[in-house]
Swiss-Prot record:
Domain of life, source organism: Eukaryota
Species name: Mesembryanthemum crystallinum
PANTHER family xref list: AMINOMETHYLTRANSFERASE (PTHR43757), AMINOMETHYLTRANSFERASE, MITOCHONDRIAL (PTHR43757:SF2)
Pfam families reported in the protein's UniProt record: GCV_T (PF01571), GCV_T_C (PF08669)
Protein name per Swiss-Prot or TrEMBL: Aminomethyltransferase, mitochondrial
Compartments, record wording: Mitochondrion
Subunit-structure text: The glycine cleavage system is composed of four proteins: P, T, L and H.
GO-annotated cellular components: glycine cleavage complex; mitochondrion
Function: The glycine cleavage system catalyzes the degradation of glycine.
């Protein structure tokens, strides 16, 4: 039985997380409430107690009956099922689809083995991040990628603009936006055992970053071993008409241990895993190098360039960026976005981009950007919350160790 003090703390933190998430969601909502889009699982969420809020023009569950703290911990101990169908999946096809995409992203897509994928970044002419995206090389003439819901319109407009110019020069590439499919994320230590009950494919030989077509519970799916929690897990693309039945099947196979989980816990999980949230930790004026994503710039791409903003990005790789994304452990109230970061002399050196109370670590964590030279682990800082300074220390990320199922 939980002690009263911890329970009260948990309830307080849950309310603060929910309030903060709702503020973020409200800022990103691109439609009035009456015009909100609904995923194929909307009625299923409502029937299961989902608290629906607007996000990027969609009505999405922020949480269910469990608190955000309890949902976060349950994902790490058992598992979570998320509806992420608001995100945009699309396919690029044609013999030139890879050369085309490599003009827009920093990754070495040509170097991927068929059936594997990677996180990459769409960049602009100044090297800033238009969006981060998970890209899968299905075959040499078929690329599947997923972009963020809040960036959908600008991403698609950006891709379409460059595709028209590319095709005008004789390039062979076409695209399809998969609005006919839903996307579910099954995450946590029970993700693989639960999914294995529903497919004949041997998931023990299916590793982090890999992609395949397969039947799950008899439904035709795209399966990627990936996620946004730091846990082992899968993202499953399924035709809309089967989404609810597939969700029910996965929950039933877990015997109640895998639970429906909303955006509140998803944000806590990704923060504990040290992962960027576009619009907070990654934006059009921030380069992949500043964001700590240098690893996403393929070796061949560093040598050849050829992508938007390459001159800026390659110079930062060579000389170092002016600012860097780092993690923090802090005292006092949880730091929130735009909280000022000062050095021990009281000089401003950066700002927080994401922060909150870690349900798993039981302490305040945050990430933000500081001027280079202030980024080493162990550096002491002050973080201003409501104008008052609180002690913090630069900390390596992830805050909670990741558990990706990688190839031996």
């Amino acid at each position: 039985m939980r002690g009263g003090g911890l329970w009260q703390l948990g309830q307080s933190v849950t309310r603060r997380l929910a309030q903060a998430e709702k503020k973020v969601i409200a800022r990103r909502c691109f439609a009035s409430e009456a015009d909100l889009k609904k995923t194929a699982l909307y009625d299923f969420h409502v029937a299961n107690g989902g608290k629906m809020v607007p996000f990027a023009g969609w009505s999405m569950p922020i949480q269910y009956k469990d608190s955000i703290m309890d949902s976060t911990i349950n994902c790490r101990e058992n598992g979570s099922l998320f509806d992420v169908a608001h995100m945009c999946g699309l396919s690029l096809k044609g013999k030139d689809c890879i050369p085309f995409l490599e003009k827009l992203v920093v990754g070495d897509i040509a170097g991927l083995a068929p059936g594997t994928g990677t996180l990459s970044v769409l960049t602009n002419e100044k090297g800033g991040a238009i969006d981060d995206t998970v890209i899968t090389k299905v075959t040499d003439d078929h690329i599947y990628l997923v972009v963020n819901a809040g960036c959908r319109e600008k991403d698609l407009a950006h891709i379409e603009e460059h595709m028209k110019a590319f095709k005008a020069k004789g390039g062979d590439v076409s695209w399809h936006i998969h609005d006919e499919r839903s996307l579910l994320a099954l995450q946590g230590p029970l993700a693989a055992p639960v999914l294995q009950h529903l497919t004949k494919e041997d998931l023990s030989k299916f590793y982090f970053g890999q992609f395949t077509f397969l039947d799950i519970n008899g439904f035709p799916c795209y399966l990627t071993r990936t996620g946004y929690t730091g846990e082992d897990g899968f993202e499953i693309s399924v035709p809309n008409e089967y989404a609810v039945d597939l969700a029910k099947a996965m929950l039933e196979k877990s015997e109640g241990k895998v639970r429906l989980t909303g955006r509140g816990a998803r944000d806590s999980l990704r923060l504990e895993a040290g992962l960027c949230l576009y619009g907070n930790d990654l934006e059009q004026h921030i380069t992949p190098i500043e964001a700590g994503l240098t690893w996403a710039v393929g070796k061949r791409r560093r040598a050849e360039g050829g992508f938007l903003g390459a001159e800026v990005i390659l110079k930062q790789i060579a000389d170092g960026p002016p600012q860097r994304r780092v993690g923090f452990i802090s005292s006092g109230p949880p730091a929130r976005g735009h909280s000022e970061i000062q050095n021990e002399k009281g000089e401003s050196i950066g700002e927080i981009t994401s922060g909150g109370f870690s349900p798993c670590l039981k302490k305040n964590i945050a990430m933000g950007y500081v001027k280079s030279g202030n980024h080493k682990a162990g550096t002491k800082v002050n973080i201003l919350v409501r104008g008052k300074p609180y002690e913090g220390v630069v900390t390596k990320m992830p805050f909670v160790p990741t558990k990706y199922y990688k190839s031996p």
